[in-house]
């Protein structure tokens, strides 16, 4: 396990938890004073009441909850969202409603999950030529159905 410091921005905020021993993500909950309705085909920025600190060897990814996606067409808009190790502000989640019905978020609702992920930094080396591959410049759909 890797230590992550977490700060509740209000005493009423509930800390994220792993729901099972095999879960890779902790559920994030909305921390809002009043319910938020997300209209179809729109998004809303949902606060969690939490801020965190962790090693620069990691990032935290914010990902959708599969149950919200399959049951309500709700997802995290910028999936995965990235929380950098040097960010100290409140974690907020952009929730998007792909569905045709309003979606109501209440205080304490589980809205997304956060996963701690290792970061491998790149060292760029500029070149005028790249090695050849069989695929070459074949892009979208080039490898088949």
Question: Model segments located where?
Answer:
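DUTPase catalytic domain/fold
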Residues: 1-145
């Amino acid at each position: 396990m890797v230590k992550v410091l977490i700060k509740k921005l209000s005493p009423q905020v509930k800390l994220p938890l792993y729901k099972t021993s095999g879960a890779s993500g902790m559920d994030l909950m909305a921390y809002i004073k009043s319910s938020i309705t997300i209209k179809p085909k729109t998004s809303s920025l949902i606060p969690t009441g939490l801020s965190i600190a962790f090693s620069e060897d990691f990032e935290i990814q914010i990902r959708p909850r599969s149950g919200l996606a399959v049951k309500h067409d709700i997802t995290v808009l910028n999936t995965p969202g990235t929380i950098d190790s040097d960010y100290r502000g409140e974690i907020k989640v952009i929730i998007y409603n792909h569905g045709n019905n309003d979606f109501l978020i209440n205080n304490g609702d589980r809205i997304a999950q956060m996963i701690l992920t290792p970061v491998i930094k790149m060292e760029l080396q500029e070149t005028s030529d790249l090695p050849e591959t069989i695929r070459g410049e074949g892009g979208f759909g080039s490898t088949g159905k």
